[in-house]
Swiss-Prot record:
Cellular location(s): Host cell junction, Host plasmodesma
Chief location: host cell
Role according to the record: Transports viral genome to neighboring plant cells directly through plasmosdesmata, without any budding. The movement protein allows efficient cell to cell propagation, by bypassing the host cell wall barrier. Acts by forming tubules structures that increase the size exclusion limit (SEL) of plasmodesmata, thereby allowing viral ribonucleocapsids to spread directly to neighboring cells.
Region (Disordered), start-end ranges: 266-293
Name listed for the protein in its UniProt record: Putative movement protein
Domain of life: Viruses
GO cellular component: host cell plasmodesma
Native source species: Cestrum yellow leaf curling virus
Biological process according to GO: transport of virus in host, cell to cell
Keywords (A to Z) from UniProt: Coiled coil, Host cell junction, Transport, Viral movement protein
Quaternary structure (record): Homotrimer, through the coiled-coil domain. Interacts with VAP.
Length: 312
């Protein structure tokens, strides 16, 4: 690491960062012409090529819960937390490897499976709705990850949803981030204290040290180059073409097709000029364009064409 004048690296449950600094003359020792173009810099020096790569720490887990529901809580909307933060922190505290334990920063939630099963005879009408919601989202419609409407007359109601995203372990009120919400639409089947059905749910998840860990699930390290490989680069905005005195904007680059130019589908466009109406002597209707006017316009167009040809 003699090529570096400065190196700072740290990783915790809240943040990971690497910062390096090196004098330009030290790059010449490696015979590497360094530029800052598209991130093509330190990765060309063999001694520090992998300095920005990091260990990939993943602990896979699955949580299963089964409980009976009293109908007093099912007669209205009721929320059941899917991610129990106390349980998660208890798991983390029991990880033997302290170095890996202190780097865990997020929980990647994969699949949530839910089964509702009635405690009464098959065929009794008991409609119920079930939804998985992201309570961090403010919009009521957009917070719904998945929803199902069913009837426990069939005894069981099964529901599965794939999330595929991560939540920081430092998220405020993490236990309420992902919720199971259910609502029954009948309150006269049993007394409120009776337990009309059970809820069994399983959550597949992973505790990891990076938001990118699952992308490298089968690798021991997280590679910086691959993270940025799929990043979209934003080009510099091109200046708007100047406006000519006649008010028309002339494009410097010809559009690839007509839709790109005016934003209207091709089948909505008429590429043929409107038919020219010429007044006849025996017509009762008067035309907006007379024959002498047309002849005069034609002569002007020819004169302009000849002028431009001579000038060009």
């Amino acid at each position: 690491m003699d090529v570096l004048d400065y190196l700072d690296m740290s990783e915790s449950s809240e943040k990971f960062h690497v910062s390096v600094l090196s004098e330009k003359d030290k790059f010449k020792i490696e015979s590497a012409d360094i530029t800052l173009k598209e991130g093509d810099d330190f990765k060309r020096i063999s001694t520090i090529r992998n300095i920005f790569d990091r260990k990939n720490v993943i602990f896979y887990g699955k949580y299963l819960s089964e409980s009976f529901v009293k109908l007093e809580t099912a007669s209205g909307k009721f929320e059941l937390p899917i991610v129990n933060i106390d349980h998660i922190y208890d798991q983390i505290s029991k990880i033997r490897n302290q170095e890996k334990r202190k780097t865990l920063s997020c929980i990647h939630i994969s699949t949530i499976q839910i089964v509702l099963k009635s405690t009464f005879l098959k065929g009794l009408d008991y409609p119920i709705s079930l939804a998985i919601t992201d309570e961090r989202i403010n919009n009521p419609k957009e917070k719904i990850i998945g929803i199902v409407h069913g009837n426990l007359a069939t005894v069981t109601l099964k529901f599965s949803v794939h999330l595929g995203f991560a939540i920081p372990l430092t998220e405020e009120d993490l236990s309420r981030s992902i919720s199971l919400t259910y609502k029954a639409y009948r309150n006269d089947l049993m007394n409120d204290q009776k337990q009309g059905f059970s809820i069994t749910y399983a959550v597949s998840y992973a505790l990891a040290n990076s938001h990118h860990s699952i992308q490298f699930a089968n690798k021991d390290r997280i590679y910086l180059d691959e993270i940025f490989k799929q990043v979209s680069f934003t080009e510099k905005p091109r200046p708007i073409s100047p406006i000519k005195p006649n008010g028309l904007k002339f494009l410097k680059k010809k559009p690839s097709n007509l839709e790109d130019l005016i934003g209207v589908p091709r089948n909505h466009l008429s590429l043929q000029p409107p038919p020219l109406r010429v007044a006849r002597k025996d017509s009762e209707e008067s035309s907006s364009t007379s024959v002498p006017e047309i002849e005069n316009l034609t002569k002007q167009v020819k004169d302009i064409s000849s002028y431009l040809k001579d000038r060009l």
